[in-house]
Amino acid sequence: MNAPQAPVLVADIGGTNARFALANPTLTSAPLLNDSMREFAVIEFPSLGEAAQHYLHHIGIHTTKGVFAIAGHVDGDEARITNHPWVITRTRTATMLGFDTLHLINDFVAQAMAISVLGPQDVIQIGSAKWEQFPLSAATRNYGIIGPGTGLGVGGLMIRNGRCYPLETEGGHVSFPPSTPEEIRILEILSQQFGRVSNERLISGPGIVNIHRALSEIDGIDPGPLRPQDITMRAADGDIRATRTINLFCNIFGTITGDLVLIQGAWDGVFLTGGLVPKLLNSIQHSGFRQRFEHKGRFSAIMARIPSLAVIHPHPGLLGAAAYARDTEQVPQEIKA
C-alpha cells in the first residue's frame, strides 16, 4: 500500500499579509486542505522563513515541499515584495524550513494557475457568453487573466493536453487607449502629471483616484485628498462625480480586457481577479464593461462569444500555488544548502 502523500505548504505573500495553507496537489478540484488557511501580518515577522515556521508550528504539521506566490518581482533564487522590505532567498528559506523542494513564483502566475482548478461556484459570469468547462486532462485552452488592485496585473494561461503554462506579463504597463472625447481629455490631464500614461494609472486603486481627480479638474472642482474607498463610498451614496468615476473605471476596464483577449488570443475566456473586482462587482455587472469588451470592430461578433468571469474564490493565490505544485510534482526543483 502506498503511503499517503505529504501535503505541500502553499503561500500567498503580499505587502501587508501572508496567507498560508496546506494543499494536496493530486486533487484536481478543491486542493486546499480544509481549515488549514491562516493569515498573518507580514510586519510581525522579520522574514518569510520565520512566518512560515510560525504557521507550521501553529498548525502542527511538517512538510518538505512548498510553493510561495510573491507579490513582487521573482528573479531566479531571489524575490522582492512590492511595498515591503523583505528580500526572500529561495535556498536560505528552504534550508530554514528543512524543505527539499521550494518554488518561488510571481503572485499573478499563481492567479493564472488557479484557472485550472476553479469551479462554477468560484466565478460569476459577466455578460451572456458562457464558460464551458472541460476535463483538464483533455483540455487545450487559452485564457487571459487581469486583476486591478494596488496595481494592474495581467497574465494568461495556456492549457495543452492537461499541462498548464502560465504567461507572466507586464501588461498593466501598456499605454492607455482612450475611446471617447472625455477619456482623451482625462489622458491629457494625467499626462501632465505622469508623462506617459499606462493602463495601471487608471485601472487600479490609485487609478480610481486619478480618474476622479481628472473629472474634478474638468468640472473646475478641487476634490481635496481622497482614497479609493472614499470615492467608492461616495458613489454608493449617490454622489454624481464619484458615480461617473466608477462608471468610467468599469468602461475602460472593459476596453482593456477586450484588448487583452485580442493580444493574447485568449479565445476561451478571460478571468477578472484582484482586490477591486469583488468590491466593484455590482458596478461592473451594470456598467458598460461588457459592451466595451465586445466593441472591437471587425472582431465584435467573435468577442461576443468569449466569456468574461469574475473570480469570487476567497483565496485564488493559494489555489493557484497548489495548482503549480500539481504541475511541478514530476519535475522537482531540488534545494542544495
Curated annotation (Swiss-Prot):
InterPro entries: ATPase_NBD, Bacterial_glucokinase, Glucokinase. It catalyses: D-glucose + ATP = D-glucose 6-phosphate + ADP + H(+). One of its GO terms (cellular component) is cytosol. GO terms for molecular function: ATP binding; D-glucose binding; glucokinase activity. It is an enzyme of class 2 (transferase). The keyword Kinase applies. It is found in: Cytoplasm. ATP binds at residues 11-16. Keywords: ATP-binding, Cytoplasm, Glycolysis, Kinase, Nucleotide-binding, Transferase. It comes from the Bacteria. SUPFAM superfamilies: Actin-like ATPase domain. Its main location: cytoplasm. One of its GO terms (biological process) is glycolytic process. Its EC number is 2.7.1.2. Pfam families: Glucokinase. Belongs to the bacterial glucokinase family. This is Glucokinase. It comes from Xylella fastidiosa (strain Temecula1 / ATCC 700964). The gene is glk.
